[in-house]
Amino acid sequence: MKILIAAIVFSVIVLSHELGHFLLAKKNGITVIEFSLGMGPRLLSTERGGTRYSLKLFPIGGSCMMAGEDDDDTSEGSFNNASVWARISVVAAGPVFNFILAFVFAMIITSVMGYDPPKVLQVTEGSPAWEAGLREGDVITEFQGKNIVIGRDLDSYMTLHGLQDETISLTYKRDGKKQDITFRANSESKYMLGFHYASEGEPEILQVMLNSSMQKAGVQAGDIIREINGVEVKDSAQLQDYLKEHPLDGSEVKLGIERNGKLETISAKPQMTKQIDSGFVYNVYREKTNFLGVIRYSATEVRYWISTTIESLAMLVKGQFSVNDLSGPVGIIDVMGDSYEAAKKEGAVMVSMQMLYWAILLSANLGVMNLLPIPALDGGRLVFLLVEAVRRKRLNPNVEGMVHFAGFVLLMLLMVFVMFNDFRRL
């Protein structure tokens, strides 16, 4: 079932992307030879208005094949016969349509589920945050210099960056008035493995912290702890009791991890970690909003995923993420399947919302990735077209073709590497 759902989600996202290229090509008088969904041999095909419309065997990818797109053809109706700005609009339309699709899906989710206001749910009385004036019900609008619109903006900051320093600066709104505060949070250093697990039931790992001992040992969210230092663990309460009785002291810890029904043993050495307590708890739950709010927060939803994708890419370039952390279609399908299984317990509406949520994430992600200035991607083609617009002369087509081919080969090698990692993690 999860493969079918993932295929539908991927197909809709790719169809939207290729539809953008298709509509702008038609608008600019460029002949579209074939518009297809999927890859491989054709299952269904029909020709209308000089364009062949095809459904292909493998529901991954798609294409909008335009006349003269990859050669020197400058005859009437060919891609190269169109003006440079017409070609720029055609190439850019794919990613733009991905953002539009993400916005449409975000409107559905926000209409049904609402948005997550960045409200303060609780402030520890007597903490530095309390002494600085922060109270329950305040709405955070800025945190450590980052603009905050929804609760997940705060959540994203905490996940990607954490609190690196005890000094916290934030802006909150109360009764329509904004107030800036700065306080020095409480902190303590202790040995930690770097993970969060479910508070009840099976001790399933919910999150593995970046650059932690657990991440380096290969532990993943979704793994279940069955043993710790040879002691059997039946539930989260038992794991919690063990850790209270045997505080981590820097000695190596052996864990029995269950993944997809298979048990494996890993070793991880706790690291001395400074824990900074902000002194307050913020909201990540959704609440209803009015029509204008739906529009505003739907745009915010798309902006959130675009900025999160860009920030994650920047961290990858800086070495804060490893290429081993990347997931391809196989890994995404697996995680989507887990989301589906969790959501179906709450009914069809929640399943629909969860899959739309994934569609927003993936559509925004695809839009950003395609705009990267990498040969063979839309962004790489846009670079050549913008240079042509400035020079008022096209670059050597053979050189451009070789650059895009080299980029395509490198992307395929990266895809093989990522898929290998996906299968290794299953």
Outline where the language-model segments fall.
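Alpha-helical transmembrane segments of multi-pass membrane proteins
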Residues: F10-V14, M65, N98, A102, ...
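Juxtamembrane extramembrane loops of integral membrane proteins
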Residues: E69-D70, G77, A82, L121-S187, ...
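Juxtamembrane boundary at the C-terminal end of a transmembrane helix
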Residues: V416-L426
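Functional transmembrane alpha-helices
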Residues: S78, A82-W85, M192-K216, A221-E227, ...
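Internal alpha-helical transmembrane segments
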Residues: F58-E125, A406
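Small-residue-rich helix-interface/hinge motifs
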Residues: K2-S75, M369-R391
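PDZ/PDZ-like domain segments forming the peptide/carboxylate-binding groove
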Residues: F103, I109-E142, K146-V149, E188-E227, ...
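Terminal peptide-recognition signature
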Residues: H17, L55, G94, A129, ...
